[in-house]
């Protein structure tokens, strides 16, 4: 069975559903890692801090978070090298997504239960994003800032809400 479109889960219209100790059968997260680049470096070692900030409230599924992380990280590795930056994915997909499976095709009315016991089974997880939250943060040198901005531009093409790239620290260094 194929995955349902992300638009089914995008809006935050239900209470949070995160209690993993009560729910069985939750698929594992696709996110491979949350910290990338030079893991030993401290954030203060780099003069520039750039963040990707969504502008709308939504839920992002773990697959789209991983796709955005992969595209940004690959670009940074190619442009800057493995240990010349530090990047962090700041959101974790806690929200459990449920789906009431529906049978289709010939004889589906005899097999399917319709809306009886329609609570659904867990099919994945999502992160709840509020406007102004930092989704990704990267730390780099002044001359690497353009590559980080390009990496974040590639990342926000993989996710739904409109995003802004904020220079959190070192903005005066970039103006020169």
UniProtKB/Swiss-Prot annotation:
Q: Which UniProt keywords apply?
A: Ribonucleoprotein, Ribosomal protein
Checking InterPro entries in the record gives: Ribosomal_uL16 (IPR047873), Ribosomal_uL16_arc (IPR022981), Ribosomal_uL16_CS_euk_arc (IPR018255), Ribosomal_uL16_euk_arch (IPR001197), Ribosomal_uL16_sf (IPR036920)
The superkingdom of the source organism is: Archaea
Please name the GO terms of the biological process aspect recorded for this protein, alphabetically: translation
**Keyword match Glycoprotein:** no
Cellular-component GO terms for this entry: ribonucleoprotein complex; ribosome
For the keyword Ribosomal protein, the answer is yes
What would be an example GO MF term here?
Answer: structural constituent of ribosome
- Name a Pfam family for this protein: Ribosomal_L16
What is the similarity comment for this entry? Belongs to the universal ribosomal protein uL16 family.
Q: NCBIfam families given for it?
A: PRK04199.1-4, PRK04199.1-6
**Protein name from the UniProt record:** Large ribosomal subunit protein uL16
The protein's organism comes out as Halobacterium salinarum (strain ATCC 29341 / DSM 671 / R1)
Q: What is the lineage of its organism?
A: Archaea, Methanobacteriati, Methanobacteriota, Stenosarchaea group, Halobacteria
Gene designation per UniProt: rpl10e
């Amino acid at each position: 069975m194929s995955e349902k479109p992300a638009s089914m889960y995008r809006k935050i219209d239900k209470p949070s559903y995160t209690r993993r100790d009560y729910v069985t059968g939750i698929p594992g997260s696709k996110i491979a890692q949350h910290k990338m680049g030079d893991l030993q470096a401290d954030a203060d070692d780099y003069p520039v801090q750039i963040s990707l900030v969504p502008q709308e409230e939504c839920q992002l599924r773990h697959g789209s978070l991983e796709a955005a992380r992969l595209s940004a990280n690959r670009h940074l590795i190619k442009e800057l090298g493995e240990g010349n930056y530090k990047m962090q994915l700041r959101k974790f997909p806690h929200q459990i997504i449920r789906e009431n499976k529906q049978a289709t095709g010939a004889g589906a009315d005899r097999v399917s239960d319709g809306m009886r016991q329609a609570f659904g089974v867990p099919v994945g997880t999502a992160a709840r994003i509020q406007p102004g939250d930092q989704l990704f943060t990267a730390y780099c040198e002044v001359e690497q800032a353009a590559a980080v901005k390009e990496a974040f531009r590639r990342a926000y093409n993989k996710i739904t809400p409109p995003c802004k790239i904020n220079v959190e620290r070192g903005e005066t260094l970039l103006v020169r």
